[in-house]
Amino acid sequence: LDNAIQVNTDACAEGFPAMSILPSDEILAQFGVRLITALGGRLNPHWLVESQREKWVLRRWYQSAESIDYELRLVARLAALGWPVAPVVEGPVELAGHYWSLAPFLPGDPPSAAAPHAEQRARGRLLAQFHADLSRIEGFGQREGWRRCEAVLTDPALDQTLTMHEQTRSEEVRILRWHLERARRRIVGLKLQARPGMIIHGDFTPWNLRFTSGRLVGVLDFELAHWDHRVGDFALSWRGKYDEVIHGYAEVSPLEPEEWELITPLWWANLIENACRDMRNGTCDDGWTIKKLLQRSVLMGQDAVGFG
């Protein structure tokens, strides 16, 4: 056990960082803060801390230094454009093999879930406005560990992984292969490599937004931000079911016909790549990926047909 964290319970079986870890006294002293409570985070754990009666967020990064720098530069650019984000004020500093940083605490609450369709449509409109500024940001290539769906779907390693696990996970592999083949057929003729790209947020979900009295006061969690097709931001904001997000987006920024065609295979490529990575790493997701692959929406067009 390194001296930067104290572990209260075992890490989860799926291979993600344990959420019960606490920053050590050494870490708290480094930033001159007092621990208040854990804030969560699937990959990058966060804690609410206090210094001189001000609240801050302490973060332990799981990414490489290169990926961290990518995110820090992006958030700083967005702050300069007037978006309510939380640029790092101290760090990152490396202690015992981990990077740590301190950022402002953004108050507010996630959008109300009382009227889900209205929330989704409003979030779609907000995403289009966010993209208008994201598209102005230049000087960013691809983030380490990411690639666009055309590279994913043409990767023979996917087929090799599925073949390797066909005997032990036959039904899961059958579902993955069926969707992989349909996604590949769907992108034929779209000339994706020639299409423009932009930086996307990657997880524009209600829990990553904060509002006060109906006013946006926080956009959180850029750990999945990367360079992609702009409709790549529909993957985790739409998830194959929240159609109003896409309709709201299109109200502000209409989609091209090719982009409508791309939404489904891009979403499936994301799921299939993650599933194959889990297979290679021997981790599991309790069936979440397969459940999402089997989700259907009228926006899928020809791919709204059921698996079979």
Label each residue range with its predicted role.
Residues L43-W47, F130, K191-G197:
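A short helix-loop-beta-strand connector motif used in the catalytic cores of GNAT acetyltransferases and
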Residues A114-R174, G197:
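A cross-family kinase active-site recognition segment
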